[in-house]
Structure formats: C-alpha cells, structure tokens
Amino acid sequence: MSANKIRCHDEVVVLTGKDKGKIGRVKFLCLSKKTVIVSGINVVKKHQKPVPNKNQPGGIIEKEAFIHLSNVAIFNAALNKADRVGFKIKNGKKIRIFKSNGNLIK
C-alpha cells in the first residue's frame, strides 16, 4: 500500500466548492472513504434533536463536514500556494517532499 500524501495536522488548501481558496488544518482523515475534515472549512448546519438522557439540548448546531481528498491540496508556505506531494527515500525511510521546490514536508 502506498503512503498517504495528505495526513492529519497537514495544512491544506481547498480547490473546489464554496470554500475554494481557504486554508485550514486537517483534523480527521478517513482513508476508507478518502475524505478529510478540515478545521473551519465546509461548515454546515445540523438540526439536532434534544437527548434528555445525555442532557444534550436540541437546536441547530454548526459542524465541519467531510471533503473528498481530491478537492484539497497540501499548502506550501514557502511559495504561499497549493502544491503536489512527492516521495524520496532518505536513510532507508520514505519521506514526503513538495514537488515544486523539493523541500521536506514537516
């Protein structure tokens, strides 16, 4: 299995949709569905019923929804734009690099 190009806590930029161009940090990554949750991006309103057992009030809450991996790209802070991810073998370990300038992704 190949390594993931986007991982948790990476800074990504949204390529399509209502939040196009916005930058955020990956909070959750679902590999089986190939989707991510990015903090502050793709915020939707959810109508929630009250749950008296858990002392949870009902109402309209805002939460981040999933975005498909194809709609986000890793953000290169050195160039201040979206970039692609490449891999190199260094000291027997596979590391991620930015394709445009070859810098290591932290």
From Swiss-Prot:
Report the domain of life of the source organism: Bacteria
Q: Which UniProt keywords apply?
A: Ribonucleoprotein, Ribosomal protein, RNA-binding, rRNA-binding
Identify the species of origin: Blochmanniella floridana
Family membership noted in the UniProt record:
Belongs to the universal ribosomal protein uL24 family.
- Subunit composition? Part of the 50S ribosomal subunit.
GO terms for biological process, alphabetical:
translation
Q: Which GO terms describe its cellular component?
A: cytosol; ribonucleoprotein complex; ribosome
| Gene name of the encoded protein | rplX
Q: Which residues form a coiled coil?
A: none
Function noted in UniProt: One of two assembly initiator proteins, it binds directly to the 5'-end of the 23S rRNA, where it nucleates assembly of the 50S subunit.
Protein name according to UniProt: Large ribosomal subunit protein uL24
Concerning Pfam families, the annotation shows: ribosomal_L24 (PF17136)
Q: Which CDD domains match?
A: KOW_RPL26 (cd06089)
Q: Which GO terms describe its molecular function?
A: rRNA binding; structural constituent of ribosome
UniProt-listed Gene3D superfamilies: 2.30.30.30
